[in-house]
C-alpha cells in the first residue's frame, strides 16, 4: 500500500502537547502514523495494530528498518481482540491515533486488502470509538481523520462514549473545491473547540505554505 496524504496529514497535525508516553495506532497499514509519532515524540511505547496480514508484515518490516525500532511494537489483531486484551491487562494509552477505513457508502472493490483498508464494514466508527473509549487514558487524546461528510455522524457516536471534539481542522484540495476531510482531536474533556481550515494546493502540484509547513519534516521533496 502506498503512503497516502491522509496519514501524513494526521501524523503531522496531531497534537503532542500532553507529552504522551504511550501511543496506539489503530489500523497501522504501512506503519506510517506510528513511525511519525516515533519521530515527533519521546514516547517509550508506540503500539500499532493491523488486521491485514500483508500490511502487518509491512508495518513490522518498516519498524525494523527505522531508527526507532526499540519503541515500536506491531500486533496482528483486530481492534476488538486487541481492546479486550488491553482492558484485561488494565492498560491505557495517552494518545490513540487512527486513519480508519471509510467510504461506507461505496461498494467494495474486488481487492480484498483494499476493501479492508477502505470500508467501514471491517471496522465501523461505532466499534472504533467504543474501543478508544476503553483504551484511552482519562486525560488522553484521540486523533483521527475522516471524510468531512461523515463528521457529524462520527461526533454524535463519539458523544455516546463521552468523547468530545477539542480540535478540528477541515481540509480541502484547493480554494475551488469542497471540504473533503476532517481532522479531529477528541478527549473525555468538554472544552471550546479550536477550529481551523487547511487548503493543500494553490494550483496543481503547487502546495500552499500552510501545507508545506505542516508536513515539511516528513517529505524529502515537496
Predicted regions: what they are:
Residues 1-17:
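S-adenosyl-L-methionine
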Residues 3, 123-179:
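Conserved Class I SAM-dependent methyltransferase catalytic core
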Residues 10, 99, 128, 186:
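Residue-level signal for inorganic ion chemistry
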Residues 12-109:
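Conserved SAM/SAH cofactor-binding pocket of Class I
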Residues 91, 112-115, 160-161:
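Glycine-rich, phosphate-binding/catalytic loops in enzymes
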Residues 100-127, 131:
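Mobile active-site "lid"/loop adjacent to the S-adenosyl-L-methionine
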Residues 177-222:
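SAM/dcSAM-binding transferase cores
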Amino acid at each position: 500500500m502506498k503512503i497516502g496524504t491522509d496519514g501524513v496529514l494526521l501524523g503531522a497535525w496531531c497534537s503532542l502537547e500532553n507529552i504522551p508516553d504511550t501511543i496506539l495506532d489503530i489500523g497501522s497499514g504501512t506503519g506510517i502514523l506510528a513511525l511519525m509519532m516515533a519521530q515527533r515524540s519521546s514516547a517509550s511505547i508506540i503500539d500499532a495494530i493491523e488486521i491485514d496480514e500483508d500490511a502487518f508484515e509491512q508495518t513490522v518490516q518498516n519498524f525494523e528498518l527505522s531508527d526507532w525500532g526499540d519503541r515500536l511494537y506491531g500486533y496482528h489483531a483486530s481492534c476488538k481482540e486487541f481492546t479486550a486484551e488491553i482492558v484485561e491487562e488494565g492498560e491505557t494509552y495517552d494518545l490513540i491515533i487512527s486513519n480508519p477505513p471509510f467510504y461506507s457508502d461505496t461498494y467494495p472493490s474486488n481487492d480484498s486488502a483494499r476493501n479492508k483498508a477502505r470500508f467501514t464494514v471491517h471496522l465501523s466508527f461505532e466499534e472504533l470509538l467504543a474501543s478508544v473509549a476503553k483504551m484511552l487514558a482519562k486525560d488522553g487524546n484521540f486523533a483521527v481523520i475522516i471524510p468531512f461528510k461523515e463528521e457529524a455522524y462520527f461526533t454524535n457516536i463519539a458523544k455516546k462514549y463521552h468523547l468530545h471534539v477539542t480540535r478540528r481542522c477541515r481540509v480541502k484540495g484547493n480554494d475551488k473545491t469542497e471540504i473533503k476531510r476532517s481532522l479531529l482531536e477528541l478527549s473525555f474533556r468538554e472544552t471550546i473547540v479550536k477550529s481551523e481550515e487547511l487548503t493543500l494546493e494553490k494550483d496543481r502540484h503547487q502546495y500552499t505554505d500552510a501545507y508545506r509547513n505542516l508536513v515539511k519534516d516528513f517529505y524529502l521533496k515537496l
